[in-house]
Amino acid sequence: MSEAEYLGGRLLLAMPGMGDPRFDHAVIAMCVHDEHGALGIGVGHVREGITLHGLLEDVGIDPGLAPDMPVLNGGPVETARGFVLHSDDWGGEGSVTVNGLCCLSASLDILRAIAEGRGPSRFVIALGYAGWGGGQLEGEMRRHGWYAAQGRPEILFETPTGRRWTQAWKREGIDPAHLVGQTGSA
């Protein structure tokens, strides 16, 4: 793939019938994608039983001014590792800009900043990530497992979690009710 074809900054949308129940109706914010592999954070499903306040308390941070919002299921890899996708109005050590979609931070500094009311204006927090080895994601896309939608910050930050998959399809001009779970060949 050429650099222009890599998917960093895009939203991966799981196709119906992709065959992996962990990714049913998944929306993955693609953070890194190159010849060595890919890493994305799931933003389409809530991690049951944990909120931001609980997460902050678990890592020894007083929730303070942080909203008590749901924590997302970022993916099946390193499910105890936290990630914050956020607006570019906050930057700390290790923050990475993701091609116009958002910034990615994974340090306790951003959690402290959020709790103290000096964090980014918009953010989502997830535990875990989705990862692919070199060429693996491309193979899954050839088998019609994923659709690469435009990375739209309004889908990430303004659309309710449970509606992100449907709304991302609609913003692409596709009615997801017309998608089928099987592909064919002529």
Curated annotation (Swiss-Prot):
Q: Where is the signal peptide?
A: none
A Pfam cross-reference name: DUF179
Check the record and name the InterPro entries matching this protein.
AlgH-like
Superkingdom field: Bacteria
**GO CC term (a single one):** cytosol
Q: Which Gene3D superfamilies match?
A: VC0467-like
Q: What PANTHER family does the annotation carry?
A: UNCHARACTERIZED PROTEIN YQGE, UPF0301 PROTEIN YQGE
- Please give the HAMAP family that the UniProt record associates with this protein: UPF0301
Q: Which family is this sequence assigned to?
A: Belongs to the UPF0301 (AlgH) family.
What name appears for this protein in its UniProt entry?
UPF0301 protein Saro_0683
> Where does this protein come from, organism-wise?
Novosphingobium aromaticivorans (strain ATCC 700278 / DSM 12444 / CCUG 56034 / CIP 105152 / NBRC 16084 / F199)
The organism that produces this protein has a lineage beginning with: Bacteria, Pseudomonadati, Pseudomonadota, Alphaproteobacteria, Sphingomonadales
